[in-house]
C-alpha cells in the first residue's frame, strides 16, 4: 500500500490518499508534482483505494505532497517519515 499525503495551505492536517499499486501511486504523485510546477492552478481528482472515497482539489491550494510505502516495520519511536515528522515536533 502506498500513501500520498497532500498538504494544503493553512490546514495542519494532510489529505491522505492510499494507492494499492506502486505504478498508480507514482502516476498520481507525478501528476500532482507536474500540476504544482506548472504555476497555474489546476483541478485534480484522486480516489483512495482503501476507502473508495474521492477528493477533488485545486492545486493552487496545495503546498506539498509526500509519497510513502507502507512497510511491515514501524518507524522508529513512532515518528512519521519525511517532512511531516518535522511539522509535528
Swiss-Prot record:
Positions of region (Disordered): 69-89
InterPro entries named in the record: UPF0367
Highest taxon of source: Bacteria
The family this protein is said to belong to: Belongs to the UPF0367 family.
Name this protein carries in UniProt: UPF0367 protein CYB_2632
Species annotation: Synechococcus sp. (strain JA-2-3B'a(2-13)) (Cyanobacteria bacterium Yellowstone B-Prime)
